[in-house]
A protein has these predicted regions:
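Conserved alpha-helix/loop element of class I SAM-dependent methyltransferases that forms part
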Residues: 107-124
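S-adenosyl-L-methionine
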Residues: 155-201
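S-adenosylmethionine
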Residues: 183-261
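Conserved SAM-binding motif I beta-strand of class I
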Residues: 148-153
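Conserved SAM-binding loop of SAM-dependent methyltransferases across substrates and taxa
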Residues: 135-147
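C-terminal catalytic and target-recognition region of SAM-dependent MTase-like enzymes
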Residues: 237-301
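Non-catalytic substrate-recognition/targeting regions of SAM-dependent transferases
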Residues: 16-32, 39-107, 114
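Conserved class I S-adenosyl-L-methionine
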Residues: 124-134
């Protein structure tokens, strides 16, 4: 039986997180708070006016882009900062000022972490596969909720960082397998082995390279990978979550791809975008929200 495809998109907001806030936005930038640090980063879609322009000049860290591929440099108002601890629920991890304007995680993903937490806590020690796991926050959130996690990323450095975050969280002994591998190759081997999972998470980049030079292109490679992931879902599987950052994509297109991959599993497909919202009215202007990522998720019920 085909899954039921939601006819309306959802906008999922990151809320109630003491270690993160979107303070203001406008003039192609966003002002955020990470722990005790205020950070100003480019955000071209914020073409409205800031609510408090003077606050932009007081940021602790400012990212200056050098090219269209998001590379650039950080400026600091005081002593340069490399990394700093943050927390979300039971998970602890390091934010880091990377040369690619982000801080080694993506705060809008907290809406997905919250959803995963609820799904996993309703299950009995489910096996969860996290592909393109990066620095491991989603893997740690899943493990904290009770899952046995397999974390896969093509970058040895990212996997080492994820393991450091596990130690920081006091989860060094948690049931997490750390795998450095190309996601497509790993999933293909798992299909041949007959492995099964109750939940799978995918957060692929638009473009990337595997540990031995494999090239990943989202639009060319995602359909086959998602089909293989659907084959890894056990009979009692609970979810398959796909997230993507790409200008030429939409939540609806991801939903149709998900429907194709899960065509015989029943259940439901929800889709939409992840967004950050300014945390409160300021200077007479209500909070604005910034859509940053698209998602589609299949759930058994």
């Amino acid at each position: 039986m085909a899954p039921t495809l939601s006819t309306t998109p959802e906008t999922l907001l990151t809320t109630g997180w003491s270690d993160y806030a979107l303070l203001d936005s406008g003039d192609g930038k966003k002002l955020e708070r990470y722990g005790r640090h205020t950070v100003l980063r480019p955000e071209p879609q914020c073409f409205w006016r800031p609510r408090d322009p003077d606050a932009f000049g007081r940021a602790d860290a400012v990212f200056d882009p050098e090219d269209e591929d998001e590379a650039g440099r950080w400026r600091f108002s005081g002593k340069p900062i490399d990394q700093f601890p943050l927390g979300w629920g039971d998970v602890r991890f390091h934010g880091k000022f990377t040369p690619f304007r982000h801080l080694a995680f993506f705060p809008e993903q907290a809406a997905n972490w919250q959803w995963l937490d609820g799904r996993i806590r309703s299950l009995n020690k489910p096996k969860v596969l996290n592909l393109f796991g990066y620095t491991g926050v989603a893997s740690l959130a899943a493990a904290a909720a009770g899952a046995e996690v397999t974390h896969v990323d093509a970058s040895k450095k990212s996997v080492a960082w994820a393991r450091d975050n596990a130690e920081l969280s006091g989860m060094g002994g948690a049931p997490i397998r750390w795998i450095v591998d190309d996601a497509r190759k790993y999933v293909a081997r798992e299909v041949r082995r007959g492995s099964k999972y109750q939940g799978i998470i995918l957060d692929p980049p638009k473009y990337g390279r595997g540990p031995t030079g494999e090239v990943w292109r989202l639009f060319e490679d995602m359909p086959a990978l998602l089909k293989d992931c659907a084959a890894l879902l056990d009979d009692d599987a609970s979810f398959l979550l796909l997230n993507a950052y790409a200008a030429r994509i939409s939540g609806l297109s991801l939903a149709h791809l998900m429907a194709e991959a899960t065509h015989d599993r029943g259940g439901r497909i929800d889709w939409g975008e992840l967004a950050l919202s300014e945390d409160a009215p300021l200077n007479g202007v209500d909070p604005r929200a910034i859509g940053l990522s698209f998602f589609a998720r299949w759930s058994a019920k």
